[in-house]
Amino acid sequence: MVFSRDIPSPASMFSTYASMMGYVMIIKPMINTIIPRPVQNFVFSYLKSFAGSRSSTLTLTIDQMSSMYIPDELYAAAQAYLSTKISPNSVRLIMARDPAEKKVKLYLSDGEVVSDVYNGIKLKWRFLARNKNNTMVEEYGQSYQGNIQRESLELSFDKKHRDLVVNSYIPYVESKAKEVNNKRRILKMHCYSHMAQTWQSVNFKHPSTFDTMAMNDDLKRSMIEDLDRFVGRKDFYKRVGKAWKRGYLLYGPPGTGKSSLVAAMANYLKFDIYDLQLASVQGDAHLRSLLLATNNSSILLIEDIDCSVDLPTRLQPPTETSQPLGAVQVSKPLTLSGLLNCIDGLWSSCGNERIIIFTTNNKEKLDPALLRPGRMDMHIYMGHCSFQGFKTLASNYLGLSDENDDTHPLCPDIKHLIDGHVLTPAQVAEELMKDEDADAALEGLVKVLKRKRLEPKKCDDESKMKKLKEGEEAIADAELAVLTPAQVEDKEELVASEYANVMPEWLPRSRLVMVLPGFHRARGIRRGLGDEM
C-alpha cells in the first residue's frame, strides 16, 4: 500500500530538477573546455551506433538516379511492381492521366507505405520525394542551379533475412516488373532536352508496320528474319565475345520510307526510340553520357548523318581558337572518332539488345570509316516505288487486293509505267490520297507516271542544247585567243592552261585543229611531228 507521505511533493521535485540543471550548466562548459569537440563527436556517434545496432530492422534505399545521374533500372522495376500492390487503404496517392491513354494511373505519394509478404517475410516499402538546392556543373562547361526533386524507395525488413531478400526477393520483383511492363507496354520516343539536361520522352504512336511498308517482299522478309535472329541470340553474342547490338544503314532518296521503316522496326520489336541530334551534342564526353543514359532494348536513331553536323576526322583535327584569360573553357567538339567509339568501340558494350540506325540521302558523301565492313551490319537501300510497293500502297489506301497483278484494269498500265526510278513511295501515296474512288485515284496516278516518263527526255534535250551553246561560245573564244607559232614557242604552257579552261571535254580534236592550226603546227614542229597533226 502506498501512503501519501511516500510521494514527494511537487515543490521538492522542482527543487531537485533545478539543482540537477544547475550542475549540468556548470559541468558542460568544463567538458567543452577539457575534451576537444572531435573527441566528443566520436563518443556520441559510437554510443548512437551501439544503441542502433540493437535494432533488428534493416533498411535498403533505392535512388531514382545513380551517382552518375543515370536512371536506376532497379528503381523503375520497383515502381512498376509496387503499382500492383497499392492497397485500397492507402492514405496518399498521386493521380495522373496520360494524354495518350484513357485510364487514370495511381502513384505513391511522399511518405506512403506499402506492405508486402514474400515467403513468410514481412517487408515494407516507403516512397520518399525531397527537393534539393543543387548546382549541376557539367564537364562541357555549363552549369544550372535550381530545385531538383530526388525520389527514392526504402525497403525495410528483419536483418536476418538480408541474403534471402537480396538474392531472391529483388530478382522476383524485377521479373514481376518485366511482366507488368510488357502488359502495359507503351513505346516512347526520347529526345535530348537542353533545359532538363537529360532525355525527355513522349508516347510513340506511329502506325507504320512491316505490313504497311511499300518494300520489296524479299527485303521485307529478310529484315524481319534478321531482327528475330538478333533478339534471340543473347547467348550467341556472349559466346563469340561481341556486344549485343545491331547496326543498320538506311540510304536512298527522300520520300522512300526510311523513317517509316524505323517506326516499323520499333513497333515490331516493342523498342523505344532515342532520336539523337548530333548538333545538340557538345563533345565526345557529352555523347558518352547520353548513350549511357539510354535503356536496353532500344533503338538509337541518327537521321541524315551526312548533313546533321560536320564531324572532324583524325586527319582533320578541330581548330582551336584562343580564349581570353579567365574565360570559361569550352569543351572540344564532337568528332567522328568519338562517335565511332561509342557505337562500335569499347563503350558500345555498356548496354544490351540495342539497335543503332543511321539514315542518309547520299551514301557516297559519308566518311569511309562509317562504311567499312563490320561497322554497320546491314546496308539497306530504300529506292523508288516498285510495282510490288504500289500494290501494298493501293491495298492500304484504296482497299485493293495485293494478291495478284490485275486487281484493277489500270494495273497493267501502272506496272509498265512505274518500272524504273520514276516515283518514290511518298509520291505514290500522295496521289492515291487525292481521291477515295479507286478509279479516279489510279487514273490520276497514270497521268503523273506518264508525265514523269516524259520529263527525262525533255531534260536530256535541254542538256544537249546547253552543251552545244557552251561549245559554240568556247570555239568563238578560242578563235579570238589564237596565237602565232612564235608566241606558242615562247609561252606554250600558258596557252595550254588557258585553253584547258575554255575547251569542253566533248569537243572533237579535229575541230580544235581547224580552229587553232598555228597552235598545233607549232607544237608539232617542236615535238618533231611536222604537219601530221
UniProtKB/Swiss-Prot annotation:
Segments passing through the bilayer: 11-27
**Sample GO molecular function, one term:** ATP hydrolysis activity
Task: Report the principal subcellular site.
Answer: membrane
InterPro entries registered for this protein in UniProt: AAA+_ATPase, AAA_N_dom, ATPase_AAA_core, ATPase_AAA_CS, Mitochondrial_chaperone_BCS1, P-loop_NTPase
What keywords would UniProt list here?
A: ATP-binding, Hydrolase, Magnesium, Membrane, Nucleotide-binding, Transmembrane, Transmembrane helix
**EC assignment:** 3.6.1.-
Instruction: Supply the CDD domains for this chain.
Output: RecA-like_BCS1
Membrane-protein topology? Single-pass membrane protein
Q: Which cofactor does it need?
A: Mg(2+)
Substrates-to-products reaction catalysed: ATP + H2O = ADP + phosphate + H(+)
Q: Which Gene3D superfamilies match?
A: 6.10.280.40, P-loop containing nucleotide triphosphate hydrolases
Q: What is this protein called?
A: AAA-ATPase At5g17740
